[in-house]
């Protein structure tokens, strides 16, 4: 190797340093984006150490989704102000992406926790549980709405949760009023709800009261049978049903094969006779 290139990196050395394939360096040279500092007549190429920083900037922009054509314009006509503007712009995009990933992680962790709890649950059991007050995001009233408006109300609820970035991975639940339960109207929820994180104003919240609830389970959409068993349990213990029942899936079709294999949890308010 001649004296003038001993302090330079060969293409192979520079590609290893930058953790890319040699073909990437060849391609960048072909499109005029990034070229070796020295090109010999015999075809050998050499890169200087200070080119590493330039390549890092190219890699950074590429990782941020900037097209190579745009990167070329930035690199060739770069000024401190222009690069600073792009870096600040991309920094904002990264912050947004980080927040999105954090929310996704929260959603996934909730799904993991709920599924683990479901796998440890005896779905044939019925019990009384004292529950603390809990706040949910509530749909508009859906009782007796025409089918398309019923569906629209659910869509509105989901849209609001997404709009305010309140989703934590909890399932959509449904509320039956006492009158519906007594009349065995189990196919027409009064409201839908979702448990969400705090932080949004001017949205419709519902507070599930603290108190005693009968907790049972619905298997494969067999709603009427599930409520019959729970009500019998309540009455055998000298109690009566309260104002509302809250239903939400523990194992839905995301984790089981077929609707007939789904499991829903029912929380039915109870009170003394």
From Swiss-Prot:
It comes from the Bacteria. Residues 8-77 form the HTH merR-type domain. GO terms for biological process: regulation of DNA-templated transcription. GO terms for molecular function: DNA binding; DNA-binding transcription factor activity. SUPFAM superfamilies: Probable bacterial effector-binding domain (SSF55136), Putative DNA-binding domain (SSF46955). Residues 11-30 bind DNA. This is Multidrug-efflux transporter 2 regulator. The lineage of its organism: Bacteria, Bacillati, Bacillota, Bacilli, Bacillales.
